[in-house]
A protein has these predicted regions:
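Helix-loop interface residues and adjacent transmembrane-helix termini in multi-pass membrane transporters
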Residues: 17-20, 116, 178, 200-202
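Transmembrane helix-bundle core of multi-pass membrane transporters
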Residues: 22, 26-90, 144-145, 207
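Membrane-embedded helix boundary and interhelical linker motif in transport proteins
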Residues: 1-17, 41, 60, 64, ...
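Alpha-helical transmembrane segments within multi-pass membrane transporters and channels
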Residues: 1-31, 36, 78-82, 186-187, ...
Length: 219
């Protein structure tokens, strides 16, 4: 989580302090982190000894004994994370970040330091991405420098699917933001169900990226 926050801080500084466009700043950070990951791992891929370490998530927890308890813990952790995010974005600082994202010019006119809120938002989001990457590496039992490719497609798919399915349900409700956060998790689950269905139908795995794009386009 802290490593991800550091990456977000670098991206934010490149964008706000040096004036580099947001997309380019994120690409530059990603390119730099590729070499950093290689330096830390020593090679392009590294196995995680599941018997030596007590892991947060592992494939053996899903397929072995006590898998039901693991799924319960996973759901509880997701709900706690949603609650924390909802609480934070309801605070003055969180509202400032949301205002900056909606309309940075108006937020700046209201006296909000948009440079600070952008950096903070990038640090939080990248911290969550880093935490997710660490958990995913534990689950897979290995880490690879290329394993994060395509993650943006999954994230966008989760957001788009949740918006299409739950937009009318969340509109106008008092806790619409909380419902939206929960809907994103459900959207990600629906996306993976569709992908699992594609695999179950024994369609060529070489076209998995194409199937993913079609799923997002359909929604």
């Amino acid at each position: 989580f802290l490593a991800g926050m550091a990456a977000g801080f670098v991206t934010g500084i490149l964008h706000t302090f040096f004036g580099i466009p947001g997309i380019l700043a994120s690409i530059l950070t990603q390119i730099g982190l590729y070499s950093v990951n290689l330096g830390i791992m020593g090679k392009s891929n590294q196995a995680v000894n599941v018997m030596q370490y007590k892991l947060v998530a592992s494939l053996r927890y899903v397929t072995g004994e006590g898998s039901e308890l693991f799924f319960v813990k996973l759901i509880v952790a997701a709900l706690i994370l949603i609650a924390i995010i909802y609480w934070f974005f309801g605070t003055e600082l969180g509202a400032s970040i949301r205002a900056t994202g909606c309309n940075p010019q108006m937020a700046s006119a209201q006296g909000i330091n948009t440079g600070f809120t952008k950096v903070l938002a990038l640090m939080i989001s990248n911290g969550l991405v880093g935490l997710s990457g660490g958990i995913y590496a534990q689950y897979q039992g290995a880490a690879d420098v290329n394993m994060g490719r395509g993650a943006i497609v999954i994230g966008l798919a989760a957001v788009i699917i949740s918006e299409v399915i739950f937009a009318k349900f969340c509109a106008g409700r008092k806790a619409a933001f909380a419902f939206t956060l929960g809907a994103i998790f459900i959207g990600a689950i629906i996306y993976y169900i569709v992908i699992a269905l594609v695999l179950w139908l024994k369609m060529p795995s070489d076209y998995m990226k194409l199937f993913s794009a079609v799923v997002v386009a359909c929604f």
